[in-house]
């Protein structure tokens, strides 16, 4: 059962409540390269990104935020550290959300300046707690970035904003240790109704990042925790978007587009099952039809293992049985089984 949080509107996307889980990513082009950021932002939008974060180290870099904002039709989040004037500059150019830790931008007057700017334009603030950068007094208390330490840090920042009657807040509480990250989110979700941005930070190289994010983000979603997600990978941000949707699909959330399933193959396999599955997935990129497609290695277990698929094939030597909703329909034969199969998919 999903844990329902208060709704927060980020540009044209609303998270929290019963709204769909929003998939985010972050640009990784140097902020000085405005053309490169704009081009990458357009690719992310085409990949299905719903909320896009861009770093803004200084007030002058708000021009990159503005350029990206004008180039795409998805909400833009400014990632701010230390320089509160950068947050003010981003508010001036119409950013849709600001990610900040109020405790690292200076005294109360600076926090209030950011809060006032955001309140005037209805810009939400994400408090982004990271296990690698907790406040010294909290680390001294707990000795390590424990779940309790991260939750205390998050609530400390929340109170800084609430002190100025600001509650248009999203919270994230990330760690590179998956069990620690999951326990932190559990504890935080139990004590706040602000929507939660879920992710595993510093997840590692691409493959390990996929595994850790799948376990951490997917695990939280299965427990009903999370309103928006970002899969952090050492890869192009478009890959993060793809991974985010795959995690949502894997844990049972409705996601537009096809899902291709295939068996791992074994000694019974007599046709290029894996190659065909990969090619089917490639050809279906960009398809918005929500169908499950199965490419199975043999007729022994294939139809039964994929009975929940909308359409599939189970191959043999020089042929494949086409089945729809688990029931055999006809045989595909010859050298162009893949093309025949694709024709049948497009008929659905």
Regions found by a protein language model. Name each.
Residues 59-80, 113-125, 185-196, 280-282:
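Alpha-helix-loop-beta-strand connector modules within alpha/beta enzyme cores
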Residues 1-26, 119, 282:
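N-terminal amphipathic alpha-helix/helix-capping segment at the start of soluble metabolic enzymes
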Residues 85-126:
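Hydrophobic or amphipathic alpha-helical targeting/insertion segments
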Residues 18-36, 55-57, 74-82, 138-151, ...:
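Active-site mouth loops of central-metabolism enzymes
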Residues 71-74, 92-98, 119-122, 189-195, ...:
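Glycine-enriched alpha-helix->loop->beta-strand junction motifs that scaffold or abut catalytic
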Residues 34, 45-69, 99-107, 169-178:
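Glycine-rich, proline-tolerant flexible connector loops at the mouths of alpha/beta enzymes
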Residues 21-27, 52-54, 76-80, 98-100, ...:
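Hydrophobic faces of well-ordered beta-strands that scaffold small-molecule active sites
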Residues 130-133, 138-285:
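Catalytic alpha/beta core domains of metabolic enzymes, predominantly
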